[in-house]
From Swiss-Prot:
Biased composition (Polar residues): 1-20
Organism field: Saccharomyces cerevisiae (strain ATCC 204508 / S288c)
Gene3D superfamilies in alphabetical order: 1.20.5.170
Subunit text: Interacts with ARL3.
Modified residue annotations for N-acetylserine: S2
Name of this protein: SCOCO-like protein 1
Biased composition (Basic and acidic residues): 22-34
UniProt key word Acetylation: yes
Keywords: Acetylation, Phosphoprotein
Gene expressing this chain: SLO1
InterPro entries reported in the protein's UniProt record: SCOC
Spans annotated as Disordered: 1-34
Length: 85
């Protein structure tokens, strides 16, 4: 018997098929887990991006409303000064 045959425990020098299948299943499971994690991260990023866009729109709308109110209050203040003189 050669040293290779002794070290692997099989007469052909190859790993038994059950060990190969186990290794392939573990690799497949790791790949599947990584794919699920990647998809979850991508979905989370998409949700965060959409929420950011929504908040930017709300912020812009509030800024426009503030500008309008500033103009309105400024006009009221000017008109009240005219009446006092």
């Amino acid at each position: 018997m050669s040293a290779e045959n002794i070290s692997t425990g099989s007469p052909t020098g190859k790993q038994p098929s059950s060990e190969v299948n186990l290794g392939e299943r573990e690799a497949g499971t790791k790949n599947e887990r990584m794919m699920r994690q990647t998809k979850l991260l991508k979905d989370t990023l998409d949700l965060l991006w959409n929420k950011t866009l929504e908040q930017q729109e709300v912020c812009e709308q509030l800024k426009q409303e503030n500008d309008y109110l500033e103009d309105y209050i400024g006009n009221l203040m000017r008109s009240s000064n005219v009446l006092e003189k």
